[in-house]
Amino acid sequence: GKVHALWVGAQGVATPWLLSTDADTRHAPDLLARAHAAAEERGLDAVSLAGVQEVRGAGENLLVPPVFALLDALLGDWEEAAAGRGPAVANGQFILLRREAWEACGGFETVRHVPLDDIAVAARLRAGGFRTGFFRASGLRVRMYRGWGEAFQGWRRNLGGLLGARHGAVAAALAVLLLPVAAFLAASVSGLAVEATLLWIAGVAASMLLRYGSGHRPAWGFLYPLDALALAGVLALAAVDRRRGRLLSWKGREMRV
């Protein structure tokens, strides 16, 4: 798989930096130079980037932007993340590694059996006393999944690994997602047209703002409350999968979350 290819490719490399990036990403011409400059200026041993996630069609727009709004909220302060003081986070679509630091932590062989190897890379570097930074980057673009089915299965796997053990965070996210929807549905079935309309408008406005903040088209906010229900469903299933140690199939392989 990818980690094995990275391990093979890194053998005998004498350059001071290693770049791990996905083949389906598109980079601005100066992206690598800017990432390297940020690492040198801030004294970082790894720089990872969160790029623009491209989505097409209703299925992808239903789920992907809300997922990234959730991840953005959980990350917290982006300035702290960029300075290397936030959580140990990395995005496998772009990780620039100081070779000596990564080799001191054991290299790619140490994350060969980990489902979320990018997060594991950041965690190992932090555990070894090294500094990792996480940045937003409009110069990195990628379309992660094709259609609703891929997006659903992909984020079920990813969220299981990222959040499955954080029961408090999962419960809080589900409450934020589902309580307004429950209020809207209750008002609708009770014939409270004005209240239901106001709740729907508030939900659409919130969805639009979150989409705008993550670089996606705000007009898809009119999918509310379907987008909130979709995210809640994927998040709940991811948490259950993690609790049960369930095996999920991904690209022909079974992976335990």
Show the residue positions of the predicted features.
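Catalytic donor/gating beta->alpha subdomain of glycosyltransferases that bind UDP-sugars
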Residues: 39, 46-71, 100-103, 108-169, ...
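Long helical/loop segments within the catalytic core of UDP-sugar-dependent glycosyltransferases
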Residues: 1-11, 15, 34-104, 152, ...
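A conserved hydrophobic position in a structured secondary element of the catalytic/binding core
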Residues: 27, 97, 117
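A short, glycine-/small-residue-rich helix N-cap motif at loop->alpha-helix starts
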Residues: 1-4, 26, 114-115
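Acidic donor-binding/catalytic loop of UDP-sugar-dependent glycosyltransferases
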Residues: 23-38
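Membrane-embedded multi-pass helical conduit in multi-pass membrane proteins
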Residues: 170-246
